[in-house]
Amino acid sequence: MREQRKATLILDDGSRFEGYSFGCERAVAGEVVFNTAMTGYVESLTDPSYRGQIMVMTYPLVGNYGVPMKAAEPNGVSCFMESDRIHMEGIVVSDYSHSYSHWNAVESLGDWLKREQVFGLTGIDTRALAKHLREHGSMKGKIILEGGEDIGFADPYTVNQVAEASCREVIVYGTGSKKVVLVDCGVKDNIIRSLLREDITLYRVPWDYDFHRIAYDGLFISNGPGDPNMCSVTVEHIRRAVAGDKPICG
């Protein structure tokens, strides 16, 4: 195993947390948030809701069950992930496990992060960091390698993350009796899997698509990343739907 490079997470209030890299070695910046789940790092990393963020995992051991194979159902929905790629800028853990064991694992978390150009930082007291974020709110942050390039902080509210996370065209799933429109503001695949358990035809539409072109029976609005103030087109479409009589969930 090669020697790990030292790296530092710097928050925009000046706080510094030093550790070691285990993913792609490039400077990254994003909004720093935390996750208290004991498992599910694969699902979190591929969840479009976390696009552009640096995720802090408070559970101490991460990576011990590796990363599953990329597989999709016949309709194209991922089997083991929440999308077809990682959306985060980086992941911060207390203790990264280089070795892994799971019946469905095909590679380590570190190798996956390298392929996806995502930074992994280990050796951090993530619970102290999470406490700091809980007390002061989510912050802008950046991860810099020792002796490497320095970069500025990234403002998450200057980029339309929803537009980047959303699908680009209408996608149709199923052939059920009822038509449901899913407004994709950064939907994760588990929502699609859950909806398709019902007897419906699901129309997944881009965030700014005028879904009133479709004679739908129900409307589902997904969650997503970024600032909702950048989604004024979506808001206008939803306002028109609210004035109607079709059921809306979101």
Describe the function of each predicted region:
Residues V28-A29, Y216-G218:
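N-terminal beta-loop-helix "entrance" segment that forms/cooperates
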Residues S138-K140, L219-S222:
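Short, hinge-like loop/turn segments at secondary-structure boundaries
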Residues Y216, N223-G250:
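Cysteine-nucleophile active-site neighborhood
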Residues M1-Y209, P228, E236:
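RNA-binding accessory domains that recognize and position tRNA/RNA substrates
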